[in-house]
Every structure is written in C-alpha cells, then in structure tokens.
From Swiss-Prot:
<dbReference type="InterPro" id="IPR013087">
    <property type="entry name" value="Znf_C2H2_type"/>
</dbReference>
<dbReference type="Pfam" id="PF00096">
    <property type="entry name" value="zf-C2H2"/>
</dbReference>
<feature type="zinc finger region" description="C2H2-type 5">
    <location>
        <begin position="285"/>
        <end position="307"/>
    </location>
</feature>
<feature type="zinc finger region" description="C2H2-type 11">
    <location>
        <begin position="453"/>
        <end position="475"/>
    </location>
</feature>
<feature type="zinc finger region" description="C2H2-type 21">
    <location>
        <begin position="733"/>
        <end position="755"/>
    </location>
</feature>
<keyword id="KW-0804">Transcription</keyword>
<feature type="zinc finger region" description="C2H2-type 4">
    <location>
        <begin position="257"/>
        <end position="279"/>
    </location>
</feature>
<feature type="domain" description="KRAB">
    <location>
        <begin position="4"/>
        <end position="75"/>
    </location>
</feature>
<feature type="zinc finger region" description="C2H2-type 22">
    <location>
        <begin position="761"/>
        <end position="783"/>
    </location>
</feature>
<feature type="zinc finger region" description="C2H2-type 1">
    <location>
        <begin position="173"/>
        <end position="195"/>
    </location>
</feature>
<feature type="zinc finger region" description="C2H2-type 18">
    <location>
        <begin position="649"/>
        <end position="671"/>
    </location>
</feature>
<dbReference type="GO" id="GO:0008270">
    <property type="term" value="F:zinc ion binding"/>
</dbReference>
<feature type="zinc finger region" description="C2H2-type 7">
    <location>
        <begin position="341"/>
        <end position="363"/>
    </location>
</feature>
<keyword id="KW-0862">Zinc</keyword>
<dbReference type="GO" id="GO:0006357">
    <property type="term" value="P:regulation of transcription by RNA polymerase II"/>
</dbReference>
<dbReference type="InterPro" id="IPR036051">
    <property type="entry name" value="KRAB_dom_sf"/>
</dbReference>
<keyword id="KW-0479">Metal-binding</keyword>
Length: 864
C-alpha cells in the first residue's frame, strides 16, 4: 500500500456544489477538514498543507467566486489529479509547462513543484512555495486563460470534470460483484471493501481494523482520552466537536435551522433541506421499471433492488440475505444482543439509534405530522403516509393470479407465495418446509428450545422479539386502534383491519367448488382444504390430524395442560388469551351487541353473528352420516363425534373419557370437591361460574325460553332443547348391545354401564360399589345425613336436587309425558316407558324387544 496523503481523507466539492451550500454547511465543512488535518499531524503522518488548508485557516472560501473558471488550487499537477483524468502524458506535461512559464513572468523562475511530499518538512517547504505561487496567481489570474486552447485543456482535465460526470448521469465505474455503478473510481474502490470485508486500517493500540481511514482516526481518539471540547454549563467533555454541538443544543434548546413552512426546527441545515422536500411534494427520482417516484436518489437506489431481487449481503450467523450493506449491519446487532441506545426517560434500551429516536417521541407526545383531511396527527412521516392511503383507498399493487389488490408492494410480494406450492426453505432437523426463509428461521428456534426474550412484568419467555412485543401489550391493556364504525378498540392494527370487514357486506373471495363466499382470501384458503379432505398437520402426542397449523398448535396446549392466562377477578385460568378476553365480559355484564330481530344482547359480535343465523332458518352444514343439518360448522363438528364415538380426553383420576376437553375440565372439579362460586341470594355453591349463572335465573323467576308445541317455559335454552325432544320422540343415540335408543348421549353413556359388570367407584365408608362416580357422590350424602334440598311447598328435604324436582311435580300435578297410543299422561318419562309395555305386550313379536328395552329377565306378567 502506498504512502497515505491528505487527499485520501479529503471531502471534495465542485464549484456548483459549493455554491449550493449555506453558511452553516460551509462552516461545518471547514471544521471537519481542519479536524482531519490536525489528526493527521498528531499521528505523525506527512501532510502537505495545500491551498485548501490555507484558505480554511484564513476563513476564506476554497473557491474563487468571482471567476467560475477558478478551481480549489491553481492547475498544478499534484497527486490529487490521478491518472484517470490525464489519459495523455504529453498533454499533462505541456499543461504543467504552460503554468510554470506563466508564473515565471513574476520572477519565480526557480519554482519547482513536487508530485508528492515525502515528509512533514517537505510539506512545509511546499507550503511556502505555494504561498509565493498564490501571490503570482492573484496578479496574473486575468492573463492565464487568455488562450482558448489552454482553457479547453484545463476544462478537459481539471478536477471540475468530476462534477460534469455527475451531470451526464453516467456511472462508468461498475462493481463486478453486485453490478452497482459509481460516478468516481474512488467510490468504487471504497465500495469493493464491502465485498472483500477488507479492513486495511488497523489500530496499533488494540488491533481493531477499519475499512476507512477516517473511522480509524475517530477510533484512535478513544485511546488518547483527550477531550478538548468541554461544555462549561454541565462540565461534560467530548472527543469530537459534533458531540459538543449536540450537547449544547440540549442545554440551550436552540435548533438553529427552522423550516419556514411548518415551523419545525432541526439541529443541522442538511436535515432541514431534506425536510423541505416534503412541502414541495416533488419526486424527481423516477424508477424506469415501475414508474414509482422518490424524493431522494438514495431512496430510488434502494427501491431498484426490489426489481432485481438480488440480495448480495448475507449474514454468516443465520444465512439471511439483504439488498443493502446497511441493512445487514443493523441485522447483525440482533445476534450480539447488545442494546447500547438507552432511553433517559424510562430506561428502555434499543439495538439501533433510529428505534430509540422513534421511542422517545412517545414521551414527548409530539405529533408534528397532521393529515388535513381528518385532522389526525402522527409522530413520524411514514405513519402519516400509511394513513393517507386509507383515505385515498388506492391499492396499486394487484395480484395477477387472483386479482387481489394491495396498498403496499411488500404485501403483494408476501401474498404471491400463496399461489405457488413451492417451499424451498427446508428444516434440516425435522424436514418441515417453508415458503420463506424468515418462517424457517423462526421455526428453527423451536428445536433449540431457547427463549431469549423475557417479559419484565411476568417473566414469561419467548423465542422471538415480535411475540414478546405482542405479549407486553397484555400488561399495559392499551388498545390504540379504534373502529370508527362501532367504537370497538384493538391492541393491534391487523385486528382492526380484520374487524372492519364485519361492517362490509362484500365477500369478494368465492369458492369455485361449492360457491361459498368469504371476506378474506385467507378464509377461502382454509375453506378449500375441506374439499381436499387433507389433514397434513398431525399431533405427535395423540396422532390427531388437522387442516391447518394454527389448530394443531391450539390442540397441543391440551397435552401440556398449561393455562398461562388468568382472570384477576375470579382466578380462573385459560389456555388462550382470546378465551380470557371472552371470560372477562362475564364479570362486567356488558352486552353491547344487540339483535335487531328479537332484542337479545351478546358480549361479542361473533356470538351475535351466530345467533342471527337462527332467524334466517338456514342450516348449510350437513352431516354426511345421518343427513342432519346445522346452522354452524362448529355444531356439525361436535355432532360428527357422535358417529365416530371417539373420546380422546380421559380423566387420570377415574378413567372416564370425554369427547371434548371442556367436558373433561368440568369433570375434574368433581374430584377436588371445590366450589368457589357461591350464590349471594341463597348461599348455594357451585364448581363452575356457568352453573352459578344458570342458578341465579331461578331467583329472578324469568323463563324466557318457551316451547311452541305446549307453551311450557324454561329459564335456559338448553333445557328447552331437551324438552322439545319429548314432542318429536326422536331418539338418535342407540345402544349397540341391546338396541335401546335414547334422546341424549349422556343417557346412552349411563345405560352402557349396565352391560358391564364393572363397578369402579367404591364408597370408603361402607364398601358399596357403583358404576358411575355421580352415583357414588349421591350415595355419600347418605352418610353425612345432610338434606340440603328442601321443598318450599311442604318443607320436605332431600339429599339431591333431582329427587326434589321429582317431588315438586306432585304439588303441581303436571303430567307432561303422554302416551300416543291411548292418550294417558304421566308425571315422569320412566312411568310412560313402563306403560308402553302394556300396548306392546299385545304383539308377541315385541315381547323379546320389550324385555331388552327394560333390561329384565322376569316374565312381563309380573310387571303389570
């Protein structure tokens, strides 16, 4: 590597560029250049103090503003003019001779200029010689370029040629690695270091290496511990003048650069200039590929990478690739786990300064970006731009496959993957494939078992940062996203977007198979799986298969038994946060969603929607086994289990199995005998809150559910449904052993025990055994001698509520069970069953069936 010169760390401006700078920017340029110069001298590196340093020290401009032909220094052949700009050696030599001959007229015949300065002393000699030369320049500047030939030569090969290259918009220097083009060779050389990862400038103190010399200079100041820039007000000292300036602004509160348009103030003029573009609305930088325009050229350059799809910068840690090196650098901080940027207000730390800046706005509550249409204000410009799209309703990015349109190109890119069945990103651990590398990366964390992101509030750990962020909202309870239509608020904008569809009646996504329409494409995609019959997501624990991964994940929680979401009101715990949210509505008693048809109110909009189907009379979900139709798919799914007979949820205490996990949960309470839910009216306690709620209706005396057949009213809809079966006479639940049919599955379950001699439930008090735990529980009351169930009519007390209910019928005299054969009525269904035997006896063919029906072996004569 050749000897380092001052020009290696020099910032250059063309004449026209210098004229564009304001006073503050020119002063900043002077400070930076002089600081670089002082640093080089301090390090003992030979520096030739050329005219630029002389001008800057004297406070003069580095450009002669009177004559546009003038350049930073007289046209001396210095190291600054590289071979790139002198293609012909003879022209270079002759040009030097012309200049020297011209200066000889002033008496400086022996003036000699060296190409490079090899020491500091030579640099001083060169400076003295140059000062003399500069004197000649001022006296003869009107004569030097009299000859047009020499003016043309100068303009062709001078430093100003670099500026001309920029205006031609030609980028002649191309990187062979990533095809990026540059105006100047020096920029290409700097860029190449990114690919080579070459750190040629090494610190002798610690051995740390840097790509650029300017970064090394800044780094070396750390080792000197010299902090010459001290602010008297707070006593704080700094290595760099720019840090001192920032500190000063904090204390004084002065921001010298103010926008005349909106009054916003900035620390420096360059930021102000960028800001001013917002008000002009101009977007001069246009993409030739898609026509999208940008306010800054850097934004256009970034955008172009989208069309090429090229991501040359790859992370060695996780393999993720990026369009830009800056994005890779930001990403790499994640792997270090460092968060050097701390908020002084709340102490929260961040990995990037930009994220800290965004966060700090929260404490100031400043929202300078206001939308004129609706008056809504935002803390940052990007949020304002996103909001603007809501009002315009524009969706310029359209999917060619299904016609779905999007507001942002990124959303379209994500959507396109849906149409391709390709999953190129495969997990080496379990073989699972993904469409995107980001999804694979998230999945891989599962195998490591690591959960590095911990909640400070409840110590719950997460495998990714986004999951932690979502979780933290639970503790704050904040719901910033509000629906303008119904006022409902949400924690996340995505939930609000999904909710808004409810208010629209449009269902653009239609199933070609069955014609069913959906509001979201995602819902249609899930629906289509039903037609294929595929269930690719299988539970490793129990072998149960599912249509989608989300259902499988929910199912897996059953096996863990974890219930992390707890109600603060009653202590009840839930497996999912959504279930807790639903539960909370019970305590508030609020029912904002009302049915216009019948006036019934609901806690959730989904419950209202399900209810409204009842009024339409539609039952689109049909059972393929028995043809029975249902208004909801969930009810159909529950019904289908009847035919399969599957009971995957088993009680570890008594071995009883259930079709649904909710039933198992309810059952488990029996073994604990805990009854935390107490009625304030009568003191009766219950295992479940739902049982207490049902009980409370008794005290109100209300019976809103009426039977259309006989006019009998009930306090609960479930009781009405059970009652209606009496009139239909339907008995869908049949015993495979003896053929006996039942109206309810629970009755069939109880009946099945008859065929088995097994009695697993034994009384510890007297040794009596029972087939059902419920029978044992009833029996145990006998030993206590308690009779908590009392008849209000006659005062008679009973061990259990069912016996009390049977007794109460005596006082009412009601006989709801009627024989279709002879019209005779009975108070209990069991009596009606016995009575029916009389009619069946007349037909000898039915005798065997009657015996089976009643599960008896004795002659029927004995029963009359």
């Amino acid at each position: 590597m050749g000897s380092l010169t001052f020009w290696d760390v020099t910032i250059e401006f063309a004449l026209e560029e210098w004229q564009c700078l304001d006073m503050a920017q020119q002063n900043l340029y002077r400070n930076v250049m002089l600081e670089n110069y002082r640093n080089l001298v301090f390090l003992g590196i030979a520096v030739s103090k050329l005219d630029l340093i002389t001008c800057l020290k004297q406070g003069k401009e580095p450009w002669n503003m009177k004559r546009h032909e003038m350049v930073t220094k007289p046209p001396v052949i210095s190291s600054h003019f590289t071979q790139d700009f002198w293609p012909d050696q003879s022209i270079k030599d002759s040009f030097q001779e012309i200049i020297l001959r011209t200066y000889a007229r002033c008496g400086h015949k022996n003036l000699r200029l060296r190409k490079d300065c090899e020491s500091v002393n030579e640099g001083k000699m060169h400076e003295e010689a140059y000062n003399k030369l500069n004197q000649c320049w001022t006296t003869t500047q009107g004569k030097i370029f009299q000859c047009n030939k020499y003016v043309k030569v100068f303009h062709k090969y001078s430093n100003s040629n670099r500026y001309k290259i920029r205006h031609t918009k030609k980028k002649t220097f191309k990187c062979m690695k990533c095809s990026k083009s540059f105006f100047m060779l020096s920029h290409l050389i700097q860029h190449k270091r990114i690919h080579t990862r070459e750190n040629i400038y090494k610190c002798e103190e610690r051995g740390k290496a840097f790509k650029w010399f300017s970064t090394l200079i800044k780094h070396k100041i750390i080792h000197t511990e010299d902090k010459p820039y001290k602010y008297k007000k707070c006593g704080k000292a700094f290595n760099i003048s720019s840090m001192f300036t920032k500190c000063k602004i904090i204390h004084t509160g002065k921001k010298p650069c103010k926008c005349e348009e909106c009054g916003k103030v900035f620390n420096n003029s360059s930021t102000l200039m960028k800001h001013k573009i917002i008000h002009t609305g101009k977007k001069p930088y246009k993409c030739e590929e898609c026509g999208k325009a940008f306010k800054q050229s850097s934004h256009l350059t970034r955008h172009k990478a989208i069309h090429t799809g090229e991501k040359p910068y790859k992370c060695e840690e996780c393999g993720k690739a990026f369009n830009h090196f800056s994005a890779l650098r930001k990403h790499q901080i994640i792997h270090t786990g460092k968060k050097p940027y701390k908020c002084e207000e709340c102490g929260k730390a961040f990995s990037q300064s930009s994220t800290l800046r965004k966060h700090e706005i929260i404490h100031t509550e400043e929202k300078p970006y206001k939308y004129e249409e609706c008056g809504k204000a935002f803390s940052n410009l990007s949020a304002l731009r996103k909001h603007e799209i809501i009002h315009t309703g524009q969706k310029p990015y359209k999917c060619e496959e299904c016609g779905k349109a999007f507001k942002w190109s990124s959303k379209l890119t994500v959507h396109k993957v849906i149409h391709t069945a390709e999953k190129p990103c495969k997990c080496e651990e379990c073989g699972k494939a993904f469409k995107r590398f980001s999804a694979l990366r998230k999945h891989k964390i599962i195998h490591t078992g690591k959960q590095p992101y911990k909640c400070e509030e409840c110590s719950k750990a997460f495998s990714n940062f986004s999951a932690l962020r979502k979780h933290e909202i639970i503790h704050t309870g904040e719901k910033p996203y509000k629906c303008e239509e119904c006022g409902k608020a949400f924690k996340w904008s995505s939930k609000l977007t999904v909710h808004k569809v409810i208010h629209m009646e449009e269902k653009p996504c239609k199933c070609e198979e069955c014609g069913k329409a959906f509001k979201h494409f995602s819902a249609l995609r899930k629906h289509k799986i039903i037609h294929t019959g595929k269930k690719p997501y299988k539970c490793e624990e129990c072998g149960k298969a599912f249509n989608n991964s989300s259902t499988l994940m929910k199912h897996k929680i059953i096996h863990t038994g974890k219930k992390p979401y707890k109600c603060e009101e009653c202590g009840k715990a839930f497996k999912q946060s959504s279930h807790l949210t639903r539960h909370k509505a019970i305590h508030t008693g609020e029912k904002p969603y009302k049915c216009e048809e019948c006036g019934k109110a609901f806690n959730h909009f989904s419950a209202l929607r399900k209810h409204q189907i009842i009024h339409t009379g539609k039952k689109p979900y049909k059972c393929e086994e028995c043809g029975k139709a249902f208004s909801q798919s969930s009810t159909l799914r529950k019904h289908e289990i009847i035919h399969t007979g599957e009971k995957p949820y088993k009680c570890e205490e008594c071995g009883k199995a259930f079709k649904w996990s909710s039933h198992l949960t309810r059952h488990k309470v029996i073994h604990t005998e805990e009854k935390p839910y107490k009625c304030e009216e009568c003191g009766k306690a219950f295992n479940h809150f739902s049982a207490l709620r049902k009980h409370k209706i008794i005290h109100t005396g209300k019976k809103p559910y009426k039977c259309e057949e006989c006019g009998k009213a009930f306090s609960q809809s479930s009781t009405l449904r059970k009652h209606e079966i009496i009139h239909t006479g339907e008995k869908p639940y049949k015993c495979e052993e003896c053929g006996k049919a039942f109206k309810w599955s629970s009755k069939l379950t109880v009946h099945k025990v008859i065929h088995t001699a097994e009695k697993p439930c034994k009384c510890e008090e007297c040794g009596k055994a029972f087939k059902h735990f419920s029978a044992l529980r009833k029996h145990k009351i006998i030993h206590t001698g308690k009779k908590p169930y009392k008849c209000e009519e006659c005062g008679k007390a009973f061990n259990n509520s069912s016996t009390l209910r049977k007794h109460e019928i005596i006082h009412t005299g009601e006989k709801s069970y009627k024989c279709e054969e002879c019209g005779k009525a009975f108070q209990w269904s069991s009596k009606l069953t016995l009575h029916k035997v009389i009619h069946m006896e007349r037909n000898p063919a039915n005798v065997k069936n009657v015996a089976k029906l009643l599960n008896i072996s004795q002659p029927l004569e004995n029963m009359r």
